[in-house]
Amino acid sequence: MTNTRKSHPLLKILNHSFIDLPTPSNISMWWNFGSLLGICLMLQIMTGLLLAMHYTADTTTAFSSIAHICRDVNYGWIIRHAHANGASMFFICLFIHVGRNLYYGSFTYSKTWNTGIILLLTTMATAFMGYILPWGQMSFWGATVITNLLSAIPYIGTNMVEWIWGGFSVDKATLTRFFALHFILPFVISALAIVHLLFLHETGSNNPSGIPSNSDKIPFHPYYTIKDILGVLLLMTILLTLTLFSPDLLGDPDNYTPTNPLSTPPYIKPEWYFLFAYTILCSVPNKLGGVLALIMSILVLALIPALRMSKQRSMMFQPMSQCLFWALASDLLTLTWIGSQPMEYPLTLIGQTASLPHFSIILILMPLANFIENKLLKW
């Protein structure tokens, strides 16, 4: 008699995706981050649902409803901070996941890669709208500055901004629609994640060596379920440590001040995980140019498969490409640091200098390194 998980119409899908899935035997800990992102998404949906039960999307009561959650709701403080810091853990896993796919050449799975880019953009939009909901000073001014960037679009820009705002400034209509979208988008992300997995399981997973592993595969369960549990425990340890000992470490103190449209904070900045793109935006003196640079700082990922010239898939045996990869990683850290500082000399100059390698490494130096490495290996 066939096992139920192999014959039941619903369990069969789960079985082929998480239990009997043929997986390369040599994948490293860097392959853990896909499952960690799934855990983060579930955690965010659960904590977000509990917060939404007590939150009011109204400009007069939004800030006090957050205070009510932290003070009066049973364990409301831990739910609120787990949700806020959970977003930070989500983006840490997300950036490492993208970096791993870059390093090991998994972007050659174009369908999986492109759905991943859409997932990244959707997650960034969701996180941005979540940052607006506490309705503190940085929420209000962050919403005003970032949405106002659309006004750089010729002809339709101003109309688009007013359409998003639901009026002539960021107000109640803006907060209400951002809350509605912030609530629904995680479910869209869940659907996109299923599509992402569907495309991945069409081709099978890549591995560190970058060569086909069809002759050496093992079932996902129990080997990689056990391995993933270790990653989950480490993630939860870091998240709980952050939430319980230093919940506001990654937040902004200005967001503990209720919104005042008549008082601008000294330096308006988004959450830390957007700072690299924000620095690139601020580094271009022209408004439209800055907006295009901001968009391209993410969309440049979509060009990587087309620019790849290497005959090898993984960077494991490509020292020049490895140096460029780590230069790109350190450049992103520099951009993040500059974004957190007030825009004044010499920080603006460092930001402009660091913005250039972000594009030049991906668009020029990586393909050039691939070409040189091919020649050195006489390919």
From Swiss-Prot:
Its cofactor is heme b. Heme b b566 binds at H97, H196. It is found in: Mitochondrion inner membrane. GO terms for biological process: mitochondrial electron transport, ubiquinol to cytochrome c. It comes from the Eukaryota. A ubiquinone binds at H201. InterPro entries: Cyt_b/b6_C (IPR005798), Cyt_b/b6_C_sf (IPR036150), Cyt_b/b6_N (IPR005797), Cytb/b6-like_sf (IPR027387), Cytochrome_b (IPR030689), Cytochrome_b_C_euk/bac (IPR048260), Cytochrome_b_N_euk/bac (IPR048259), Di-haem_cyt_TM (IPR016174). Binds 2 heme b groups non-covalently. GO terms for cellular component: mitochondrial inner membrane; respiratory chain complex III. GO terms for molecular function: metal ion binding; ubiquinol-cytochrome-c reductase activity. Its main location: mitochondrion. Keywords: Electron transport, Heme, Iron, Membrane, Metal-binding, Mitochondrion, Mitochondrion inner membrane, Respiratory chain, Transmembrane, Transmembrane helix, Transport, Ubiquinone. It is a multi-pass membrane protein. CDD domains: cytochrome_b_C, Cytochrome_b_N. The chain crosses the membrane at residues 33-53, 77-98, 113-133, 178-198, 226-246, 288-308, 320-340, 347-367. Heme b b562 binds at H83, H182. The keyword Iron applies. Component of the ubiquinol-cytochrome c reductase complex (complex III or cytochrome b-c1 complex) that is part of the mitochondrial respiratory chain. The b-c1 complex mediates electron transfer from ubiquinol to cytochrome c. Contributes to the generation of a proton gradient across the mitochondrial membrane that is then used for ATP synthesis. Heme 1 (or BL or b562) is low-potential and absorbs at about 562 nm, and heme 2 (or BH or b566) is high-potential and absorbs at about 566 nm. The cytochrome bc1 complex contains 11 subunits: 3 respiratory subunits (MT-CYB, CYC1 and UQCRFS1), 2 core proteins (UQCRC1 and UQCRC2) and 6 low-molecular weight proteins (UQCRH/QCR6, UQCRB/QCR7, UQCRQ/QCR8, UQCR10/QCR9, UQCR11/QCR10 and a cleavage product of UQCRFS1). This cytochrome bc1 complex then forms a dimer. Belongs to the cytochrome b family. This is Cytochrome b. It comes from Cynocephalus volans (Philippine flying lemur). The gene is MT-CYB.
